[in-house]
Amino acid sequence: YKNTDKASLYANDDGVHQFAVAPSGSADSAINWTTAMIIDNAGIVRKTYQPAFSANAVETNNVPINTWQTVNLTEIFDNNADFNPSTDAFTAPVGGKYQLNGSIRVDNLQEASGYMYIRINTSNRGYYSIVSPPAFDSTPQYWSLVINHLADMDAGDTATLSFYIAGGTVGADIHSESIF
């Protein structure tokens, strides 16, 4: 160990390259290595703790109109424990660029609604996409709003998915096929 939390190990076995890291310990103590990256003979790179998550929406009926609604989510997978289902938020573990994608399936929307937004809201800014139901010739049974953005996030910044519907007399429904 050169410094605290600076232990690293490289191993090569039958052409498979393995990179491991560990917090420092004391002399003669066991080291608990964590495999950070593996590169196999085919050149396939695996980063076990690379931040990645997927969550689908909890079906929500009659979403309130004229107010932002954070989409309630259920975790599908979370590689690095960076998604918190109790807050419906992803937290960036380190500073960097993060590809964030969201899709909301809206059911029972009204032609009388003024417009609908989907937003990925990060600690630094919000990213929006909009659609205007009055442009339809009739009331659609369902509609999908999609947003994709490469966001610059600092360590500890959060990202959530939200929805807004303006006007109309009743809110639409967020279907469980919606994802973040």
Predicted features, each with a name:
Residues Q18, Y117-N121, T160:
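Beta-strand signatures of extracellular beta-sandwich domains
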Residues E111-R125:
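Short, surface-exposed beta-strand/strand-loop-strand elements in extracellular ectodomains
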Residues F19, I39-N41, R46-K47:
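Extracellular beta-strand solenoids
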